[in-house]
């Protein structure tokens, strides 16, 4: 006869935003797969945070899905775990919008990107890239995070900085 030693009650695991989490201090938006990807990244590596229309799987060397969350929301969560690169003038890059599409030729979502960047590096500047140049840079990125973002021109490339002790 075998005794049942160390059995735990069949209590449900804690939930947040509909998903299970087993680590403290890490947003449940960050999946285990995404956590592994950002842990593997080094200084200067880039990550594409892509909207729902972006061809993430065909463009990216690696593509991880983050459906149900917007790009700025994912960006805020990521920037609690790694810094933006402060060794370059513009550690952020967005795709230029066609002239006249938005007031001031700025996609409204860029304000949310700015607010997210300000949580880590308020002096961070954005590169404004032509569509084709952005796509070529995205192909070289460490990975693409495909979000559920529905805002037009809701893509951003973020460059990882150095974690200082």
Short names for language-model regions:
Residues 45, 49-53, 60-77, 81, ...:
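Conserved mixed alpha/beta catalytic, RNA-binding, or beta-rich assembly cores of soluble enzyme
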């Amino acid at each position: 006869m075998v005794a049942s030693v160390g059995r735990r009650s069949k209590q449900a695991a804690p939930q947040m935003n509909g998903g299970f989490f087993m680590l403290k201090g890490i947003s449940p938006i960050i999946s285990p797969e995404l956590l592994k990807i950002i842990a593997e990244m080094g200084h200067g590596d880039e990550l594409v945070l892509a909207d729902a229309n972006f061809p993430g799987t065909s463009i990216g060397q690696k593509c991880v899905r983050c459906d149900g969350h917007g790009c700025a929301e994912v960006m805020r969560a990521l920037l609690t775990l790694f810094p933006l690169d402060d060794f370059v003038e513009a550690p952020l890059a967005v795709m230029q919008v066609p002239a006249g599409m938005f007031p001031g030729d700025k996609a409204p979502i860029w304000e949310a990107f700015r607010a997210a960047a300000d949580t880590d590096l308020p002096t961070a500047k954005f590169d404004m890239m032509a569509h084709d140049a952005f796509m070529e840079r995205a192909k070289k990125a460490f990975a693409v995070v495909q979000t559920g973002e529905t805002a037009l021109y809701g893509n951003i490339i973020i460059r990882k900085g150095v974690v200082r002790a």
